[in-house]
């Protein structure tokens, strides 16, 4: 289940404007229809959890977890549903990973933009211990990933313990900016210091939301790329949007990204995917990341 918002207008600065959606759902037997009512919300830079940002509603999905509506008979479940947005149907697929106990929705078909997404599972869901590391110390690991090479889209899930930037043991005291810095400082395959890795990224917005009594931290950022003679200026960075939640001492993060020049078109769709991310109640298939974390088979 995902939250939708209309296309973003052209940016007039490094921050981008977005519209949030107020959602009411109606269920008739086995069929479901999500009715979307739009209301305008604009971004600002880093927002504090002490004062709610107007952007706080942009990425919030429905409070009920997807597991209420989806069968969990296998470690990975895929489902489809149609979501109406401004009279157009956006078909969403739903991915449920029982191994790591999370779910999210991803776009399949967007008629108003004449888009048919061509997703490939570049990394099928796997336990934390056998997942590919995103940093030299192997703390942060990518447990699943899907890509659309045609539209240059990537949606991935990573898991890793908090680093020293999160000094408090009480997660409800963490700010979204602190969580973003913790994740981004670990997110690199380069052998550089954490401060250098942070310099590669520019956080545009960060805020937190409480969903079912648990904090979810949302942040939007750019990752700069090294310029080359053949690269156009608009391709020198990727635009990311992420959501992080904590369970059992580990941070679970969904990352969705595209090229910076495509953000106006693809950003609203990726925001729906990130807004739908939820940690699910563990099933018998769940393998906690602290179980044999260095077992690679």
Curated annotation (Swiss-Prot):
Keywords: Chloroplast, Plastid, Thylakoid, Transit peptide. It comes from the Eukaryota. GO terms for molecular function: calcium ion binding. InterPro entries: Mog1/PsbP_a/b/a-sand, PsbP_C. Disruption phenotype: Smaller plants and frequent morphological defects, including increased lateral root branching, aerial rosettes and multiple rosettes. No effect on photosystem II and linear photosynthetic electron transfer. GO terms for biological process: photosynthesis. It is found in: Plastid, Chloroplast thylakoid lumen. One of its GO terms (cellular component) is chloroplast thylakoid membrane. Its main location: plastid. Belongs to the PsbP family. PANTHER family: PSBP DOMAIN-CONTAINING PROTEIN 5, CHLOROPLASTIC, PTHR31407. Involved in strigolactone biosynthesis. This is PsbP domain-containing protein 5, chloroplastic. The gene is PPD5.
